[in-house]
Amino acid sequence: SGRTGIVLTTPEFLSIHRDRFARSGRIGFVVIDEAHHAGLAKGGDRSAYLDMPDILKALGDPVVMAATATATAPVVAELARMLPITRTVVDETVRENLQLEDDRDLASRENRLVSIVATGEKTVIYVNSRDQSVALAKTLRKRVPDCATHIAFYNAGLARSDRRRVEEAFRDGSLSCIVSTSAFGEGVNLPDIRHVVLYHMPFGGIEFNQMSGRAGRDGQPAVIHLLYSSRDARINERLLDCYAPERDELVTLYRALQTMWRSNRGKTGDDSFSASDIDIAQMCLAIDARTPVDERSVESGLGIFEELGFCRVSGFDDTRRIAMAENPGRVQLSRSIRYLEGLRSRMEFSAFRSWALDSCASDMLAKVNRPIVPRA
């Protein structure tokens, strides 16, 4: 009807409802913020971005602008191919208001964290899992009782309305400390963050810059605190292993899926079965008690198998159904983009790990102060 001029949406919503948007005939300009996600989508991160070429064609090929402060040359090349984009504008502004306090491998990082939170200044603490965000927020409320009502956790598992309430409370000063996964701060204008704490090690250079760069966006002095350790690196490596399980793990997972599929078909006659990631991981352990397969490996493995044509997955969570291919034949793992991207992520983290643990503080601050941009 023309009553709405601007629509804010996610790539997933746009992908699902592309035909409805196309029927309006009114989409002339598409802006993709935090566009590095689109450039990294081949690894299974926000895979709806991979639909962008078809979406834009359905919308009548509108003008497209992509914006990000963290885009390497390969990411820019992928964005240009996907969207497509013919012109790149680079702003190499250098920030001068940030300090970096290096407390890597500190004996008691929790004590150091308590002293930061006790200042009452706006603080964002980044951890690597939803469970950790909840647990650390609970710990800080106990250890800094004067600030207990001003501390909250934030992660993608919260309802959108709850996330919005946390953001607004932090913005208006009702909250002074947020313990979060990388979900907090992206796409939200929060200029007056005085402390950013990397409690756990980020997964790569882009994430390091994204998190650290959220400090002091108002131009006033702000501090980045490095509290991660070499122990965190080992945890990250295990998490990344889940995204690209080893061949032996995938063999065990495939045997488990086949066992559950055949058992269910024998009992019910149904060609598909329903099982949680935990159920499947337990079946893997029953087959091989030494397997490292867990629920995270199951999720990644299912994605790889579906890509290779070994299975078909429909629905989500409790409604998910899995159907195995009768005779899929032999297929090389290298034909799975998801598997290859998982291997690439592991290799990239290996290089980042050395930099994140061994670089001097001045070099690390210089990396934050300069945006990640494509270099000639």
Where do the language-model regions lie?
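Interdomain hinge/linker at the junction between the two RecA-like core domains of SF2 helicases
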Residues: 58, 70-118
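Catalytic P-loop NTPase motifs of RecA-like helicase/translocase cores
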Residues: 14-15, 37-46, 73-74, 187, ...
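Loop/turn-to-beta-strand initiation segments
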Residues: 3-6, 26-29, 60-65, 122, ...
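Inter-Walker segment of RecA-like/P-loop motor cores
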Residues: 1-16
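Conserved phosphate-coupling serine/threonine residues in phosphotransfer and NTP-handling enzymes
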Residues: 10, 68-70
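SF2 helicase catalytic motif II
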Residues: 12-13, 19-63
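C-terminal helicase lobe
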Residues: 120-138, 147-182, 188-376
